[in-house]
């Protein structure tokens, strides 16, 4: 029998196959959940000294194996990307692409860099469109329209200030009419929408300022106005500086494999030397993309195509555009987590999502702790919400997607439980031992990142662990209980508003830990330290405290000598006046 004559599976067979995959996926997820919970709760020791002070348990072994596997697959993905052939792009057959930029109260310096980098993209001009949509049409928002017109002055740019948006109710009578009396004629459709679509589909460089509606409304306008006029759609934020090769490398990934529906690039920090927060964020970003997402890309299931740099197949995007925009959670319309839900919609269709380190951009990150905390809280909200949606489609992708989702979803809860248990029921050495293990694992992960990147400064990533434990961890629990509250969060940079709500869980967390610490110290002060086991514990406590202090002295010295000096000089960084 010839291959083309092979019988196709019947719909019933497809349904049975899909059901079987669902059952197996659920069983696998429950297995991972059960094993992790049992390993954590049972506390099975694998190795220990005679007094049980230096112990290594099954749960620790599981997490260590997870980090090793993740690092290995990330390395293999980088090897695969580096070995891939990269021939020149044929301008005659290049896919048509629309670069969409979402803008909201952007700092003028960042916006100018973004637009200039869009002009400098190495992609056939005839196959590339640039569309910026501004969230706001008031007088104070129009400086972004003027800047777009200025930067693209030689490209015959088109600009339009729209009184409404796609979801603003339009009244024909309010739009004006022709004639009088019984022969009065009114517009049948919103003339603003028609004008926007006509400009977007006929001009190469277009900027639209529309009625405020949030970032998702802005992105919807760009996607809807484009329709099916292009092959691929690139998303970008207005604080992002694109590498000249960024778009070309993304296009190559989609061109190489029709099963890939979306691809993301390497997002780096534009202002790493503004503060210690932005510096640690720059290191964390690199690991998040080049280790964690590179690992996911090895299995074709990247969980989030980041907003500053992503490319989607337009024919697929248009299929779920309305469902994406109208997403609701607990009865509330979702206005954040746009990028993660776009990725989830693509995954729900069974298409792969990829990451390539060859495509790169630079994006602004908060330099103040409070604004960083607000950003992380907002991102955590979308993570938990999208985790639930993502679970519906685990069966359509590699088992790694299920495994990693379960592990990463449970991790914050296990960390919080461990910390509280040690502070309230543990002895001083047990608490110090866990802190040493946490920093040891963080240092090992940072050392691998330093080797993979070829940059010794990456070892300072281990300083991010306390920031996670003391700041990000309580923020995640605030996000969990406020998932249905929405807003732009940290996206507007021209006018920064302080939001002190994320400090509340930090204060509660600090009080909980302080209470546990006081209780443990009071209990240990009454204990008898004369026995051999207590003497050994005192010795380990002194040695461990010395090692812990020595570690911090070394890391902080490296930071102050190698980084903080550069922060003062702002070498290689970007200082933006707000």
Curated annotation (Swiss-Prot):
Cellular localization per UniProt:
Membrane
Q: Could you tell me what this protein is called?
A: Hyaluronan synthase 1
Highest taxon of the source?
A: Eukaryota
**What EC number(s) would the UniProt record show?**
2.4.1.212
Task: Tell me the organism.
Answer: Homo sapiens (Human)
Which EC class does it fall in?
Answer: transferase
- Primary localization class, coarse: membrane
The GO terms describing molecular function are: hyaluronan synthase activity; identical protein binding
Keywords recorded for this protein, A-Z: Glycosyltransferase, Membrane, Transferase, Transmembrane, Transmembrane helix
* A single cellular component GO annotation: plasma membrane
Taxonomic lineage is: Eukaryota, Metazoa, Chordata, Craniata, Vertebrata
């Amino acid at each position: 029998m010839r291959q083309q004559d092979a019988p196709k599976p019947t719909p019933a067979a497809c349904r049975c196959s899909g059901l079987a995959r669902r059952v197996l996926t659920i069983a696998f997820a429950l297995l991972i959940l059960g094993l992790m919970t049992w390993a954590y709760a049972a506390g099975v020791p694998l190795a220990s000294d005679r007094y049980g002070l230096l112990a290594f348990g099954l749960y620790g072994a599981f997490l260590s194996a997870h980090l090793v596997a993740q690092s290995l697959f990330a390395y293999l993905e980088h090897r695969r990307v580096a070995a891939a052939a990269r021939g020149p792009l044929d301008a005659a057959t290049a896919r048509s692409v629309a670069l969409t930029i979402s803008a909201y109260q952007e700092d003028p310096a960042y916006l100018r860099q973004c637009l200039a980098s869009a002009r400098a993209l190495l992609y056939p001009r005839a196959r590339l469109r640039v569309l910026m949509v501004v969230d706001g049409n008031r007088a104070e928002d129009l400086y972004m329209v003027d800047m777009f017109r200025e930067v693209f002055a030689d490209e015959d740019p088109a600009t339009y200030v729209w009184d409404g948006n796609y979801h603003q109710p339009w009244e024909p009578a309010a739009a004006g009419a022709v004639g009088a009396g019984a022969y009065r004629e009114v517009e049948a459709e919103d003339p603003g929408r028609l004008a926007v679509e006509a400009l977007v589909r006929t001009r190469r460089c277009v900027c639209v300022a529309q009625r405020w509606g949030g970032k998702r409304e802005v992105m919807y306008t760009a996607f809807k106005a484009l329709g099916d006029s292009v092959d691929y759609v690139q998303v970008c934020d207005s604080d992002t500086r694109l590498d000249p090769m960024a778009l070309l490398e993304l296009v190559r990934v989609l061109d190489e494999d029709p099963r890939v529906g979306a691809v993301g690039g390497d997002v780096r920090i534009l202002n790493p030397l503004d503060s210690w927060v932005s510096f640690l964020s720059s290191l964390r970003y690199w690991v998040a993309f080049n280790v964690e997402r590179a690992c996911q890309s090895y299995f074709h299931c990247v969980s989030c195509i980041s907003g500053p740099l992503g490319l989607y197949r337009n024919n697929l995007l248009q299929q779920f555009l309305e469902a994406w925009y109208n997403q609701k959670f607990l009865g509330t319309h979702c206005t954040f987590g746009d990028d993660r839900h776009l990725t989830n919609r693509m995954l729900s269709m069974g298409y792969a999502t990829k990451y390539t380190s060859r495509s790169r951009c630079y994006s602004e990150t908060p330099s103040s702790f409070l604004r960083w905390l607000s950003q992380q809280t907002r991102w955590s909200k979308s993570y938990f919400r999208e985790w639930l949606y993502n679970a519906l489609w685990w069966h359509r992708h590699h088992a790694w997607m299920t495994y990693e989702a379960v592990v990463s979803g449970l991790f914050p809860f296990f960390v919080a439980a461990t910390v509280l248990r040690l502070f309230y029921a543990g002895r001083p050495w047990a608490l110090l031992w866990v802190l040493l293990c946490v920093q040891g694992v963080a240092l090992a992960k940072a050392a691998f990142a330093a080797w993979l990147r070829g940059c010794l400064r990456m070892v300072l990533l281990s300083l991010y662990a306390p920031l996670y434990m003391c700041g990000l961890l309580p923020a995640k629990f605030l996000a969990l209980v406020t998932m249905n509250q929405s807003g732009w969060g940290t996206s507007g940079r021209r006018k920064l508003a302080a939001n002190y709500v994320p400090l509340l869980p930090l204060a509660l967390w600090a009080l909980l830990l302080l209470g546990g610490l006081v209780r443990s110290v009071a209990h240990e002060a009454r204990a008898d330290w004369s026995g051999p086991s207590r003497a050994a514990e005192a010795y380990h406590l002194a040695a461990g405290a010395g090692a812990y202090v020595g570690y911090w002295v070394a890391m902080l010295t490296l930071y102050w000598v190698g980084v903080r000096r550069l922060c003062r000089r702002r070498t290689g960084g970007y200082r933006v006046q707000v």
